[in-house]
């Protein structure tokens, strides 16, 4: 029985990055032997055990064979005669197919160390093309390590194109797809994830609504980058630079989908793209069974982001309607995330990344002014029901008028 550290822990140590999760592979042992040593079984599909003291995962060395479509279409074979090299060959990338023995020696049968040096994301074997989830995983690794100069190897990108064109991506479950997408959006360069999917044809399969934005022009006066797809990539880049949460990043990815529906004859203007994009946002949210908080913010940002850009010009009545649309009195954080997404949209324009966005402070101040209105004096006057609601609305409108006048004097 031999135990090896494998995968990400070896890769990240060689890169000089913090090692958070450690995976182990056990060669030459059976399930019975693991149980006899006190390991607890947790693997439903193949033999994985938890260490009795550390709680870390130990998997028996195994091979796998394609047996159906999609991420789960594999049969596994785990036994004491499976070698370390056989176990490593089933892994996706060479940089993830290294092991380390108990003396700290690196076992690297597929050139992972050389690819780390060359900053290449390269597949281990042609079996890479059997698992469609690997398209998303490679794009996610590209987003993680772009800052270190990593790029996808040309031959690996070719295999990803093959997978994208095979229809296999459609066999991925919504849950698995969302898990990879959400993790990728939180990487240091989420725009690289989208770019790689675009380059290999997978974006057109998974999110055709986003793919449709590439090549669609916008007015150069407002968008020096012109291309709407390029703009979305820039907005995601700003999200990462400003450490935005997943809700904001997801909303930013989808905020301009309506521009993909504009007739070429109307380019580069995109009148009413906000409302035209809402059915597309709803469709993507359903497709990946996106969590409710991400769904709601994406829809609201899609509908109202241009309101934010024009915030300083909005009448108090329009401003009040905007705040009520967000239920800002009970859910102030959602409005704050909307403002953040709108600011990322404004900053995601080439050459305008550092331009001030006074709309953010103005909108947050307006929300504070409206929320400061107390219902207590109105209740003490004996108002209730619809009459109370109308009186509260008038009081909030008066507060917003006063706020706007005060800001106008500043």
From Swiss-Prot:
Gene Ontology terms describing biological process: RNA repair; tRNA 3'-terminal CCA addition
Family: Belongs to the tRNA nucleotidyltransferase/poly(A) polymerase family. Bacterial CCA-adding enzyme type 1 subfamily.
EC number(s) per entry: 2.7.7.72, 3.1.3.-, 3.1.4.-
Subunit structure: Monomer. Can also form homodimers and oligomers.
Protein name: Multifunctional CCA protein
SUPFAM superfamilies with a match to the protein in the record: Nucleotidyltransferase (SSF81301), Poly A polymerase C-terminal region-like (SSF81891)
GO molecular function, one term: tRNA binding
Function: Catalyzes the addition and repair of the essential 3'-terminal CCA sequence in tRNAs without using a nucleic acid template. Adds these three nucleotides in the order of C, C, and A to the tRNA nucleotide-73, using CTP and ATP as substrates and producing inorganic pyrophosphate. tRNA 3'-terminal CCA addition is required both for tRNA processing and repair. Also involved in tRNA surveillance by mediating tandem CCA addition to generate a CCACCA at the 3' terminus of unstable tRNAs. While stable tRNAs receive only 3'-terminal CCA, unstable tRNAs are marked with CCACCA and rapidly degraded.
PANTHER family with a match to the protein in the record: MULTIFUNCTIONAL CCA PROTEIN
Gene designation per UniProt: cca
């Amino acid at each position: 029985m031999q135990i090896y550290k494998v995968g990400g822990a070896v890769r990240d140590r060689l890169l000089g990055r913090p090692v958070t999760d450690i995976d182990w592979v056990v060669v030459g042992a059976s399930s019975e032997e693991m149980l006899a040593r006190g390991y607890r079984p947790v693997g439903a599909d193949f033999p994985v055990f938890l260490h009795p003291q550390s709680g870390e995962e130990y998997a028996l060395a195994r091979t796998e064979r394609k047996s159906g479509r999609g991420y789960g279409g594999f049969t596994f074979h785990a036994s004491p005669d499976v070698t370390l090299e056989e176990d490593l060959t089933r892994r996706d990338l060479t940089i993830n197919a290294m092991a380390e023995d108990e003396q700290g020696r690196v076992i690297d049968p597929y050139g992972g160390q050389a690819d780390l040096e060359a900053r290449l994301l390269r597949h281990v074997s042609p079996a890479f093309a059997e698992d469609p989830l690997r398209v998303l995983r490679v794009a996610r690794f590209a987003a993680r390590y772009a800052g270190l100069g990593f790029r996808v190897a040309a031959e690996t990108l070719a295999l990803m194109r093959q997978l994208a064109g095979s229809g296999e991506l459609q066999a991925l479950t919504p849950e698995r797809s969302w898990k990879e997408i959400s993790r990728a959006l939180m990487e240091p360069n989420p725009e690289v994830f989208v770019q790689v999917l675009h380059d290999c044809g997978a974006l057109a399969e998974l999110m055709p609504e986003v793919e449709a934005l590439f090549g669609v022009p916008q007015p150069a006066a407002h968008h020096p980058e012109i291309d709407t797809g390029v703009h979305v990539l820039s907005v995601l880049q700003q999200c990462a630079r400003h450490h935005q949460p997943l809700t904001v990043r997801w909303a930013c990815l989808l905020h301009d989908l309506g521009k993909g529906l504009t007739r070429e004859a109307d380019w580069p203007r995109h009148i009413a793209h906000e409302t035209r994009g809402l059915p597309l946002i709803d469709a993507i949210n359903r497709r990946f069974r996106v969590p409710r908080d991400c769904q709601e913010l994406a829809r609201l940002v899609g509908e109202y982001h241009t309101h934010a850009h024009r915030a300083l010009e909005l009448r108090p009545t329009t401003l009040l309607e905007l705040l009520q649309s967000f239920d800002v009195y009970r859910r102030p954080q959602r409005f704050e995330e909307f403002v953040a997404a709108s600011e990322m949209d404004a900053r995601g324009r080439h050459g305008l990344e550092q331009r001030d966005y006074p709309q953010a402070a103005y909108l947050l101040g307006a929300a504070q002014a409206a929320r400061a209105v107390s219902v207590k004096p109105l209740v003490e006057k004996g108002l209730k029901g619809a009459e109370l609601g109308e009186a509260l609305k008038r009081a909030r409108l008066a507060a917003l008028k006063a706020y706007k006048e005060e800001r106008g004097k500043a």
